Regions:
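Active-site acidic/histidine proton-transfer and metal-coordination neighborhood
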Residues: 29, 63-71, 81-172, 176-222
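Gly/Pro-rich active-site loop or hairpin
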Residues: 15-22, 149-153, 180-294, 307-311
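Glycine-rich, proline-tolerant flexible connector loops at the mouths of alpha/beta enzymes
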Residues: 38-64, 304
């Protein structure tokens, strides 16, 4: 059986942090108060010296750990391929950045690092020896619109299995299992003048797997009346897409679970009954619980809808614990 621990990615509290309502210590303290057993830190957002970690920052993190009882369990790195004005980073440059991130993760005491899939499968293969040397398990984030069964992710599976390395794998984001439209996007469209009838028509086109270009043509007259509808329809085919069922995707998750180092418990809106309205946690958590997974599910509140970040994070942690019978 699994040994699931619950944590929080500090990204969940990014809005109060960026607005100055909480400093970094306040964010860590709040995560502890909400029941996190550990936290993921988004390096670009909260480490002043990123991509490096200073001795002073390590000292600060260790003092917070002594005070609040939780420390960083995952170093969330970014692969900013487009950071230069005139060209994309080469693969060699991206590999070098990933190695720097591995070293920083190790210095901070993290044994897991989230990497983005802008790093190619070959790049992941190349960093495996460094991950092992620094005892940092590097997981490619499986983020919507990818899923455990899409060709791009299967290319990583092939490399992981070919190398046999225990230090390269995945960090699945539960948003890739969505089966209903995203509530924040839906509500914004309503506020911009779209009707429920128009939005339901858009959703049905997505459920029916009508290609985006064709769907745009079908909805052209409605989009002309309400331009915001175009962005909402486009989002249904992008990073917040959904499908009728996630059964196949969950079967794919079962296959890659031995390669998973952490899981992102994505949430956009958790209601007062502890139900995420678009992501079927009631189907996802039993799959993880029945496995041999030994790691964290970290709450990741996306904060697209302007809801209270602390309330949403609190609800999500409670929902996961309830489904895990913890």
């Amino acid at each position: 059986m699994s040994k699931v621990k619950t944590g929080i990615t500090l990204f969940s509290l990014g809005t109060p942090y960026l607005k100055g309502k909480l400093d970094l210590e306040g964010v860590i303290r709040t995560a502890a108060e909400l029941g996190a057993e550990g936290y993921e830190i988004v390096a670009t957002q909260m480490i002043p010296s990123y991509p490096f970690v200073s001795d002073e920052f390590v000292e600060f993190i260790n003092k917070c750990k002594e005070k609040y009882g939780i420390g960083p369990i995952c170093y969330s790195a970014n692969m900013d391929r487009g950071m230069l004005k005139d060209r994309d980073l080469t693969e060699d440059e991206m590999v070098a950045r990933a190695i720097t991130d591995i070293m920083s993760a190790n210095k901070l005491g993290c044994t897991v690092m989230r990497e983005q899939y802008l790093l190619s499968p070959e790049g992941l293969k190349r960093i495996a020896p460094y991950a092992e040397a620094y005892n940092v398990h590097v997981g490619i984030e499986i983020h919507n619109p990818e899923s455990p069964i899409t060709p791009a992710i299967m290319d990583y599976v092939k490399v992981i299995e070919e190398t046999g390395s225990k230090y390269i794998g995945f960090v699945p984001d539960f948003g890739c299992f969505a089966i209903k439209p995203n509530k924040p996007y839906w509500d914004r469209a309503l506020a911009a003048g779209a009707t429920e009838e128009q939005l339901n028509k858009c959703a049905q086109l997505r459920y029916d797997e009508v290609p985006l270009e064709e769907a745009m043509k079908i909805m052209a007259e409605d989009i002309e009346k309400c331009p915001a509808l175009g962005g909402t329809l486009n989002s249904m085919y992008g990073f917040v897409q959904f499908r009728k069922s996630c059964t196949k995707e969950l079967e794919g998750l079962k296959r890659i679970l031995p390669y998973c180092f952490e899981m992102h418990g994505k949430c956009h809106y958790v209601d007062e009954n502890l139900h995420e309205v678009s992501i079927p946690y009631e189907e996802i958590i039993p799959v993880v619980a029945a496995s041999d997974y030994d790691g964290f599910i970290v709450t990741e509140y996306e904060d697209e809808g302007g809801y209270d970040a602390i309330e949403q994070t609190t609800r999500h942690v409670a929902m996961v614990k309830k489904l895990l019978n913890q």
